[in-house]
């Protein structure tokens, strides 16, 4: 009976020991003998094994809140990491963009500022140069107008000087004088031939040849004189353009007027026709 009464206490004590004390702790009673210690040890081991199995079953049947909490935290952490990865990547990209923009702005301020200043200065210069350029164009136009006005005034002065009589020799004057000089030279040659005939008379053949030459030569001289007079009278007449009368061979001006030269009649007829035309 003593053993039967002690069994429930031992069982309870073994359960308490299994729950309170760490495993593999032996229970011994010093009051009883060595023979009683062995069954108590075996019973304690069996009770401890039963209690550990029950504890394991309870742990398996009952959910562990710590594990669930740890799993939830892991899932949340995974979701947070999964959600934070794109956020972090976007944040990094934004940071990189900001850094790049700040670097670019620094470079622009450091290196490109002179270019901007140059462009601004060029724009300012172009804006300021447009009125300057316009003023320069106006000045050049004014200078051209002044030069033209001066040239016009110079030309008008020349025309006035010509009208007053102060005139330089022109091409027309040189042509007329040259033609008159040639005709006079030809006529003088003819006059010299007639003078020689007086001092040393020629033969009849020489006189006939001289008379043959004299007619066309006098005609040419008269045409030259007529051309000179036409050139003189088509344009405004001047004193130097009036043809002078040719002197006869061995005759004065009065004798020539009384006895005209044989070819002089032709000149008068030609000049009269020219005057009629004019």
From Swiss-Prot:
Compositional bias ranges of the Polar residues kind: 13-31, 78-92, 120-137
Localization, UniProt: Nucleus
Pfam families (UniProt xref): FRG2
Highest taxon in the source lineage: Eukaryota
Keywords from the UniProt entry: Nucleus
Database matches in InterPro entries: FRG2
GO cellular component: nucleus
The keyword Nucleus is assigned to this record: yes
Name used for this protein in its record: Protein FRG2-like-1
Name of the gene encoding the protein in the UniProt record: FRG2B
